[in-house]
């Protein structure tokens, strides 16, 4: 099955709503509409930017989509500081990241919570980008594939085969995030292939073949081509490079198969 590449820009805790508008405008200007037939492009701003991004995307009829970096497992109630999937859906979000390593590390989120958040996203017709990945000591011990398979199972626990078919998986080796280090294309392919095999056992081979598996970890315009050329890598969850409109547009154009804009 042919899977359309997805390039997702995770802005993390960067850019106020004025800066968000400027960046989306720059991406839209740098990446002509013709590329969107071959690649899906989404930006993932902070919560406080979403309304401004929605207004711009809708008003200018831009073809890129947008989403959020997290959501609550709850729909509403006395959960101070939380943001529900219902709120994100009302803002027109398409995607939402769950289980990013920074959430797992700094907020002690475990696989059970990630699975609950993924279910909450699907309930509100949002596509969860479910993140998994190993720390350096796990890779150096040679346990990276087993670790990621276990994390995947835990993060999908309770989801039906049909629901699994609606998610995106992002493999993000923790040691490569924001460090400038990047897994080699063959290293990334090894884990992404194992992820797809595990998806087949959890759902079906047909569903596994339809799910997009992204690589995240210092993705940029220089390495995305080699990464996305791998059989089981369908795009990138992009961090720092997504804050540069021209580089992000170039990265998306490469994922679309070129030529450069």
From Swiss-Prot:
Amino acids binding substrate: 10-12, 178, 218, 239-240
Compartment annotation: Cytoplasm
Enzyme class: isomerase
GO BP annotations, alphabetical order: gluconeogenesis; glyceraldehyde-3-phosphate biosynthetic process; glycerol catabolic process; glycolytic process
Cellular component annotations (GO), alphabetically ordered: cytosol
Main localization category: cytoplasm
Pathway, per record: Carbohydrate biosynthesis; gluconeogenesis; Carbohydrate degradation; glycolysis; D-glyceraldehyde 3-phosphate from glycerone phosphate: step 1/1
HAMAP family reported for this sequence: TIM_B (MF_00147_B)
NCBIfam families: tim (TIGR00419)
Subunit structure, as described in the record: Homodimer.
Protein name per the record: Triosephosphate isomerase
Organism annotation: Mycobacterium avium (strain 104)
